[in-house]
Amino acid sequence: MPVVLAAAVLCLSPSVHDGDTIRCGRERVRISNIDAPELPDSPKCQDRRRSYAWCDFAAGEASRVALVRLLSRGRVMIERLGTDPYGRTLATVSVGGVDAGDYLISQGLARPWR
């Protein structure tokens, strides 16, 4: 199914899954420019087959909490950029002009995604 790309849109009911994935209603949104540490329930860390996974669970929780706090500061905007292999929307996420990915990187709670 093709994804219609649009200008930034308001996310009315954001919820945070982990440091780099949120939900806007039913839409799963992956913050496009970062990789955040995994949480303990991540299959990437359970089976240890994915060497690229960042399996620092304390940092994963800190990243999730920081994103929750950032998103609670104001209107959450998403700018859709495409989809990832898991069917999530890839997007830039911002609050009050602050890019969520850049913010988490600046706090040491995420790394740039390549």
Residue ranges and their predicted role:
Residues 2-114:
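Small beta-barrel nucleic-acid-binding modules, primarily SNase/OB-fold domains
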